Structure formats: structure tokens, C-alpha cells
Amino acid sequence: MGIFVCRNSLRMLNVRWLYHRCLSLYNSNHGFNEAKIKEKLAQFTGGSVDLSKMDNGIAEICINNPSRMNAFTGTMMIELEERISDLENWKNGKGLIVYGAENTFCSGSDLNAVKAISNPQEGMMMCMLMQNTLTRLQRLPLISVALIQGKALGGGAELCTACDFRLMTEGSEIRFVHKQMGLVPGWGGAARLIHLIGSRHALKLLSGALRVHPENALELGLADNILLGTEDGFLSEAENWIMPYIKGPSDVSRAVKKVIISGREQKLEDALRTEKEIFGTVWGGLANLQALAKGTKHK
């Protein structure tokens, strides 16, 4: 009985931690009015953000606006937030692949929406919405991969940094073009880029608006692999690539992602305590007991 109570207490601690991790960065205390900016963005229609969830625990998000190089319209920004909310509540999920329709990843914000949100106040509201959304994407208990075909420009480059891994195809490129627009990244891309490749390399990419091709991205640590297949087969290749990392029970895979999130975002002492709590949710669990019975540790 005592063990049961202890394990349930640990689970409750983990639930509270996960809830805290999924909280948005900004709320009304920061001057963020989500309803107001969504009402503004809803005026700029077109495209879609499509979500599919498969029985193998892999979800796919497709940025679907090919006539605009998969640029985010206002309604697409809203839809992305809704898709992330859906995935936060998907208890059996293990992996996520983010890709763009018709062999192009994403070219950032649609210029029609950008031109209409020209004052700093509304621009910062849009920035806060997208930072909230992409931070929640990064904190999902799913191992995520950005499949980059064609161009990942501006906000598209920022989007790919919110995923755990990046797979690039031959001829693709990542480019932070913000400086050419008289801007800096606003969706969290600069902060995430520094964590990925270091401040010195990040400064070069941002200040020079440099084109990062697959080989260079691999060398920098921005990309994790280069896919060499055909256009019709890249999504299947991405699924095959992620499969070894999500193999096994979903609760174990999700626990692995959670300890990585805590280690990345919390102070050492807090991360250690969180790791202990998450460890308690899988110790003595079904997967652990089955592995012990089979003696699979060194196999």
C-alpha cells in the first residue's frame, strides 16, 4: 500500500511539473491579449496547418500553403497553436514530424499579414503568440523532427529550431532572412539557435543572413542528417529515421523527453529533483518489470 501511495504521489508531482512546463511564456500579466491578436490574425486567411496522428505513435504536422511557399497566414498561426494544444493532450504520442507541403518547408510569415500588423504593439502581440506556441512545441513530451525540403526562411527557420532534430534534403537551405527585412527573429529562433550552435555561429547566420546548406548545417550541428532519397519518399525516410528513438512503450519515450526538457530549462538542482520524480513514474512500471524479467539490459 505504501509503495502504491508513493508511486501515485510521484505521478502527481510529474503531472504538476508537466503542467508547469506547458504553461505559456506570456499571459495578461505581460500585456498579452491572446483573444485580441487572434481576432486580428483571423482576418488574414489562406492555407492550413494539418495534423495527422498515427497508430504507431507518430504525428505529422503539415504546413500547407504551397502557393505562398508555405508562409504562415494569420489563420495558420492560430491553427498551429490549436494543433499543439491537441498534441499536448495526446497521451499515446511518441514522435512528431513537422514538414511543408509540396517539398518546401516554410517561408515564414505571409507578407499580407505582416503589412497589416505594422505597429509595434500588434507586432509584439503576434511575437508573443508565436513564442508561446513554439515553446509549447519544444516542450511537448514527443520527440520531434523538422523535415526540411526546399527552403526554411525567416519564421520557417525559427520553426525548425523548435524541433528536437532537423533532417535536410539535398538542395534545401535554412536561412534567417530577418535582417534583410529590417528585423530580428521574434518567434524565439535566435535564443534557440544559440543553444543549438553557439553564439558565435548564430551571430554569423543572423548578421549575414547566410544560406545554410545541408552539409554546412550538418557541420554546425544545426542538422542531424541529410536525406538522399526521392521527393515522394522523404516523409517515409523521416519516419524511419525517428523510429529508433521512439521504440518501445510511450510512457518511457515520453519520460525520456521530459528529463531532457527539465535538464535544458531548469537550474541543476531543480532538474535533478525533476529527474528523480520522473524516474519514479517508470521505476517498477510494466516496461521496467518486463525488461528485468527478460534480462534485456545488455542485449
Swiss-Prot record:
Pfam families: ECH_1. One of its GO terms (cellular component) is cytosol. It is an enzyme of class 4 (lyase). It comes from the Eukaryota. Keywords: Cytoplasm, Lyase. Its main location: cytoplasm. It is found in: Cytoplasm, Cytosol. Decarboxylates ethylmalonyl-CoA, a potentially toxic metabolite, to form butyryl-CoA, suggesting it might be involved in metabolite proofreading. Acts preferentially on (S)-ethylmalonyl-CoA but also has some activity on the (R)-isomer. Also has methylmalonyl-CoA decarboxylase activity at lower level. This is Ethylmalonyl-CoA decarboxylase. It comes from Xenopus tropicalis (Western clawed frog).
